[in-house]
A protein has these predicted regions:
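Short, solvent-exposed loop/turn segments at secondary-structure junctions
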Residues: 1-4, 83-87, 155-160, 209-213, ...
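Serine-esterase "nucleophile elbow" of acetyl-processing enzymes
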Residues: 1-43
Length: 304
């Protein structure tokens, strides 16, 4: 996949190299048989895709190359999230595969087999089946990466966005397609993550539940796109872990209420409706929603 990581990744400045960015590769599906032959998969070209950068990653996940790439590579650390579990997949004969944000459906190969494909979500499976599939991935991958070299980035789909008029509101339902994330799967994803944490003990970064979307930086509104500060905070912790500066294995603290954080001045340039924010802050506190910290931080930035 494309390796700019939302414009935040700067590991090369620290002597770090990103070997692979395996975009939308699903750990459970990675352990299943390839649905099509190499010759068929090779017919997929950039011209058939809306997002041309996804052609390589789409071919890789159709050929089930995820695990071989990781095992045969030179990477010392594996960073994984369960984002793709939110998105619908296809069953075909004795296997299943992801759609690469629906890109597969527009290919000649996707159109050829359209009538033979069944769309569904992995969270429809009983936990004993799904967890077993994911365990198989981790059991295999831990032949190379031990618990101190795997970083699980927990993923809590956001339901809200800061719009350009300064108000924070719900992301419109029409922006939540079956091939995109939806907050209805958050509890399922949280429980799956907790299972992996309890069983395999990786490093954990748990920050997404504190952030919302931002229409100032995302034209493509969907529930997996966050404020830029989320990416900064996440990558800062990844760097801390890899450079062995982290004492804890579970990180869930955000640098809110800190005017020295990198995005503070950038945040001040956005519009923010303070009165509306006060109402939301009170609602979040009343509902024990973790976003109360985010909203209080914004109130202190825009109305100190």
């Amino acid at each position: 996949g494309i390796q700019d990581l939302h414009g935040i990744y700067q590991g090369e400045k620290l002597g770090l190299e990103l070997e692979y960015f395996l975009d939308k590769h699903n750990p459970a599906l990675a352990m299943l048989p390839a649905p099509f032959s190499r010759e068929e998969v090779d017919t997929i070209t950039e011209e058939q895709l809306t997002d041309k950068t996804r052609v390589k990653s789409l071919r890789q996940q159709l050929m089930k190359e995820t695990v071989p790439l990781l095992l045969d590579g030179e990477s010392e650390y594996l960073i994984v999230d369960f984002y793709d579990f939110h998105n619908y997949i296809f069953s075909y004969k004795d296997t299943a595969f992801g759609t690469q944000a629906n890109e597969f459906c527009g290919t000649a190969l996707g159109k050829k087999y359209k009538e033979e494909l069944q769309a569904w979500n992995l969270f429809q499976l009983p936990t004993w089946v799904l967890y077993g599939m994911v365990d198989r991935f981790f059991d295999t991958i831990m032949q190379k990466f031990d618990a101190d070299h795997i970083i699980l980035n927990r993923f809590w789909t956001n339901a809200m966005m800061l719009f350009k008029d300064g108000k924070v509101g719900l992301i419109p339902e029409e922006c939540k397609q079956p091939f995109q994330c939806h907050e209805k799967y958050n509890v399922n994803c949280f429980n799956l993550e907790q299972h992996i944490i309890d069983k395999y003990h990786p490093y954990v970064i748990d920050l997404s539940r504190y952030f919302i979307g931002d229409a100032n930086i995302w034209d493509n509104w969907n529930a997996s796109h966050f404020e830029r500060e989320f990416y900064r905070e996440t990558y800062d912790q990844i760097i801390r872990i890899i450079t062995k500066q982290a004492d804890e294995k579970y990180f869930d603290k955000v640098r809110f209420f800190d005017s020295s954080r990198p995005g503070y001045q950038e945040d001040k340039e956005r519009k923010f409706d303070v009165e509306w924010g006060i109402q939301l802050f009170e609602q979040f506190v009343e509902n024990n929603n973790d976003l109360w910290k985010n909203m209080l931080d914004k109130l202190l930035v825009y109305a100190p």
